[in-house]
Amino acid sequence: MLLTIPELLDAAQLAEIRRLLADAPFTDGRYSAGADARRVKHNEEVDPSDTRVRALNQLVLMPLYRHETFQAAALPRKLSGAFFARYLPGMQYGAHVDDPVMGPEGGRYRTDVSVTVFIGEPQSYEGGELVVETDFGEQQVKLPAGHAVIYPSSSLHRVSPVTGGERLVAVAWAESMVRDPARRQMLYELYQVHEALRRDNPDAEVTRRAGHVRANLMRMWADV
């Protein structure tokens, strides 16, 4: 399931993120990639040891974690820190699958859900589409600043070459309470049905049953 989250960040948050990134030290993005991805990765990322990263993470990850759609769709158990990536003309990220397990010793997490938050406006760069392979074919994603997209980390994906301007994004990963993406999608669709029923018929028996079914499926599938 590929899902967009519109307007995750507001104008003030975006302005502060851009201010912090303006003079942040960027390093070769290959340093953070696994062995296979390193061969096809060509971008730059903010040095994770830089003092700005803490503030940048708070600006991006707190709104993400609190967002109702993210909670319902990703069912996060853990959320990684964010990587702040820059693509200049000629840079790209070839087709790859994210590493299944990330993080340092003592802080490992399974990557179930990948997140990209767009920091720059789409008209500020040429090319640079995020391309995700899904059951319905390739999906190209290039969203307005402040919007986010989430998709299963098991998906083959790439970033098309940037031919002009500067592509700025934040990327992160969630370990989900439900590791199977098909089950997560089913639970999210049940959530949508239940929310619609609660809005239109809050006291109906079918509303209670829909909530009951979703709760028991979570109990059956959740890994906590």
UniProtKB/Swiss-Prot annotation:
| Protein EC | 1.14.11.-
One Gene Ontology biological process? intracellular iron ion homeostasis
What is one Pfam family matched by this protein?
Answer: 2OG-FeII_Oxy_3
InterPro entries in the record: Oxoglu/Fe-dep_dioxygenase_dom, PKHD_hydroxylase, Pro_4_hyd_alph, Pro_4_hyd_alph_FE2OG_OXY
Source taxon at top rank: Bacteria
Please list the GO terms describing molecular function.
Answer: 2-oxoglutarate-dependent dioxygenase activity; iron ion binding; L-ascorbic acid binding
Q: Which cofactor does it need?
A: Fe(2+); L-ascorbate
Every Fe2OG dioxygenase domain range: 78-176
Q: Which UniProt keywords are given for this protein, alphabetically ordered?
A: Dioxygenase, Iron, Metal-binding, Oxidoreductase, Vitamin C
Gene3D superfamilies, alphabetically? q2cbj1_9rhob like domain, Rabenosyn, Rab binding domain
Q: Where does 2-oxoglutarate bind?
A: R167
Cofactor note from UniProt? Answer: Binds 1 Fe(2+) ion per subunit.
Q: Which amino acid positions bind Fe cation, per UniProt?
A: H96, D98, H157
Q: Which NCBIfam families match?
A: PRK05467.1-3, PRK05467.1-4
Official protein name in the record: PKHD-type hydroxylase Tgr7_2199
Q: Which organism is it from?
A: Thioalkalivibrio sulfidiphilus (strain HL-EbGR7)
